[in-house]
Amino acid sequence: RDRETGCELKILPGMYQLVNGEVNVSKLRPVNIDDLLGREEISVNMEEILNYVSGKTILVTGGGGSIGSELCRQIASHTPGKLIIFDIYENNAYDIQQELNMKYPELNLIVLIGSVRDYNRIEKIFAAHKPDIIYHAAAHKHVPLMESSPNEAIKNNVLGTYNLVLAADRWKVKKSVSYTHLTLPT
């Protein structure tokens, strides 16, 4: 069911089968998650995962982006000790900061502007806040754009991740999760 419209979504048999009379429109069926994934659904206990952040200092890189901001929303709803949003884009960081401050006024929220490319900046953040868990979502993700700027993709996605790994090791961070998606270049 669509959350905004309340409409029930159904899947139609293939056009070839419809045209050849092999099936008819009465064979409409509700859409399953398997239809969208193209594989079986993996069962994950989200409550257990999110409860893990309770009381901990959490750093979310790329916290203002599409993936990072959703991570911040989910984490904020499970009472972290401190949530640190780290993003290079102040507008995105500001927007999620305002949203979370309105929804969770008691949240210990720190918003920092900077780049994962800057190891010294990362070191200062780790020294000041000593994160328990890092969710790394700072990345260039639009493959066609990065194909024409591969040096920028490498500096941000590879070296930025490397900087975080070095700092996490140095500061003995307990857990680190990297969020990315893989796409085959054209």
Q: Language model features by range: what are they?
A:
Residues 2-57, 64:
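Flexible, Lys/Arg-rich cytosolic regulatory linkers and terminal tails that connect or flank
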Residues 64, 69-73:
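N-terminal Rossmann NAD(P)H-binding glycine-rich loop of SDR-like oxidoreductase domains
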Residues 114-130:
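Conserved Rossmann-fold cofactor-binding substructure of NAD(P)-dependent oxidoreductases
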Residues 180-186:
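Conserved small/polar residues in nucleotide/adenosyl-binding loops
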